[in-house]
C-alpha cells in the first residue's frame, strides 16, 4: 500500500496543538523548525503546501501567565489574539531560513458562508500559492462566537482543502491513527490502515474529545476526512511524532490511517453549499420529495414542503430534512421563509396567485441543490 500523498500536488497540512507547543506551555520552537524544514523539502519536490496550525491560544496562555485553558470565550479570544502574534513570528523566522515567505490568513465561518467572500478567500490563497508563499491558516478566534465557530482546526483544514481544491489533507496528531476501538481500553482494538472516507462505521470507531490543550478528538478528524472527500481529496491521519513524517508520506510510505475519497468531486458551487456549517433555516419535506431528490435528481417543488423552519432570505442556503429531521440535501432557495410558508404544500401553478409574483416554479432548483 502506497501513501495517497505521494501523487498529491496540492496538500493541506493540519498540525495539532500538542505538536507545536511545550505541553500547552507556549510554542515549541524546535518542533516548528522541524515542520518548516519538512515543508520546505516538500516544496522542493514540487508540492504546494497550505499549513493549518494550532497553537495560538496555547502561546497566548503562556504569554499571559495562565496555567489552565480558560472556559470563557472572551478570555479564549484574548489569548488567541496575543498568541497569534507569536505563532506568526515563529513560523516566519523558521521559513525564512529556507528562503520561503509565509502569509497569515485568519478565517471565520462567515468568510466561507458568504459566496463573494468565499471566492475572494479562494482567489487570495491560490495567488499566494502561485507566488510560492506558504499560507499559514487559523480561525480568527478574536471575532467569532460559539455559535459561528468552525469548532476545531480539523474542520477548518477540510474546509480549506475544499476551498483550494486540494488533492490531499494531512491531519497530524499525537496518535498513530484510527483504531476500531480505543486501544487504551480495549486490548482487541485493531489499527485501521485504510478505509473509505464517510463510511458510517468509522464514526462509531472514533473516540471522544481531545486534550485540554486542543479541541479535536478522533471523531472530528473522521468527520473532516468525510468533508474533504466531497471535493475528491484523500485524507491521512498520522502521528506527528514520526520522524520526517511529511517527507516519508510524500515519498510514498504508508503511515497512519488513509481515508480515501470516493470517485468524483462536487462542482465548486455545490462544494460551497455543502461546506456551510450553520444554516439560517430548513424545510421539512415529505417522502415523495425525498425520493425525487435522492434518487431522481429532481428540483424541490413547494408542493413537497411540509413545514418551514427558521428565518431566511431568498438566495440563502437552507437544509432539506425528512420527517425524522435527517438532512438529505441543501440548496439555494428561490423564496424567503415568509414566502415559503405561504406556498408550502401548493402546486407551482399557484405560486403567482398566492404571492403576486413568480420567481421560479421550484423552491430549490436541482442545479442549486446538493445531497448530503
UniProtKB/Swiss-Prot annotation:
Transmembrane parts of this sequence: none
EC number(s) stated in the UniProt entry for this protein: 2.7.2.11
Annotated ATP binding sites: 14, 173-174
Reaction equation(s) it catalyzes: L-glutamate + ATP = L-glutamyl 5-phosphate + ADP
Region forming the signal peptide: none
Annotated pathway: Amino-acid biosynthesis; L-proline biosynthesis; L-glutamate 5-semialdehyde from L-glutamate: step 1/2
Every PUA domain range: 280-358
Enzyme class, spelled out: transferase
Molecular-function GO term, any one: RNA binding
Record PROSITE patterns: GLUTAMATE_5_KINASE, PUA
Organism superkingdom: Bacteria
Location of the protein in the cell: Cytoplasm
Gene Ontology, cellular component aspect: cytosol
Binding-site residues, substrate: 54, 141, 153
Function: Catalyzes the transfer of a phosphate group to glutamate to form L-glutamate 5-phosphate.
Family indicated by similarity: Belongs to the glutamate 5-kinase family.
Protein name, UniProt field: Glutamate 5-kinase
Species this chain originates from: Cupriavidus taiwanensis (strain DSM 17343 / BCRC 17206 / CCUG 44338 / CIP 107171 / LMG 19424 / R1) (Ralstonia taiwanensis (strain LMG 19424))
